[in-house]
Amino acid sequence: MEQIGLIGYGSMADMIARQLLKHEQIKENELFIETRTKGERLRALMSDYPNVSADPLENWANTCQLILICVPPLHVIETMRRLYPYVNRNTHIVSIAAGVPLRLLEAETEAGISRVIPAITSEAEAGISLVVHSEALAAEKKERLNELLSVFSRVREIKESNLDVASNLTSSAPGFIAAIFEELALSAVRNSSLSKEEAFDFLIHSLYGTGKMLIEKNMSFEETLERVATKGGITGEGAEVIHASVPDVFDEVFERTLRKYELLTEQVGKQT
């Protein structure tokens, strides 16, 4: 019997819990959750899976082989210290928080450590889970975590030094994409008599179809543009504007988000 604990129950924790239960990677009575606020999200889960336990970690942490910390970054170290009396070298602790590096996590415990950055698109089983394992973590624990994540996402192990940039392309990307396409839709509304609902509907289906084509036909962005934009045509005209204007926007996106990651790490470091 493999028992799994979740500490914190936001949208990512809910996605992980539901996917593990849905794919029968764990039984209801093997899942333990601690959350400070037992809100609608947790009540909905327990309505669907009444045998899930929602209790303080002190009641179950010493029985769990895998514990996922799903609290905000500035609460991770505090949570690690609460866990300390209940875990050992055989425990595998996973943090899904941005800005809390392995070195700070490892300093708080003798348990094995991994970092996972999940994506909300894994709700549709179309996301990527970024994974960084501690060098000291046993191979079988790495494999088991990767196996669990792979039932609802594509698992990609990467260098921790690349994790923040990669997170912008996976975990944050749905938000960035939504912001970009919202502005495109609103521009269409300003330049026509289309309703916002019509513009959004057209774009959502175009976005879905483009992603499907890119994956199923293994096409690059460049190939897609070549297929759509004829030389001297209308699409090419619009693409030229985007190529001229957007690089500076995205450079600023990365500059500001990477600085935010750095500030988070500095703040967490002051807690140790």
From Swiss-Prot:
Disruption phenotype: The proG proH proI triple mutant is auxotrophic for proline. It is found in: Cytoplasm. Its EC number is 1.5.1.2. Pathway: Amino-acid biosynthesis; L-proline biosynthesis; L-proline from L-glutamate 5-semialdehyde: step 1/1. The keyword Oxidoreductase applies. One of its GO terms (molecular function) is pyrroline-5-carboxylate reductase activity. GO terms for biological process: L-proline biosynthetic process. The keyword NADP applies. Keywords: Amino-acid biosynthesis, Cytoplasm, NADP, Oxidoreductase, Proline biosynthesis. GO terms for cellular component: cytoplasm. It catalyses: L-proline + NADP(+) = (S)-1-pyrroline-5-carboxylate + NADPH + 2 H(+); L-proline + NAD(+) = (S)-1-pyrroline-5-carboxylate + NADH + 2 H(+). Belongs to the pyrroline-5-carboxylate reductase family. PANTHER family: PYRROLINE-5-CARBOXYLATE REDUCTASE, PYRROLINE-5-CARBOXYLATE REDUCTASE 3. Catalyzes the reduction of 1-pyrroline-5-carboxylate (PCA) to L-proline. This is Pyrroline-5-carboxylate reductase 3.
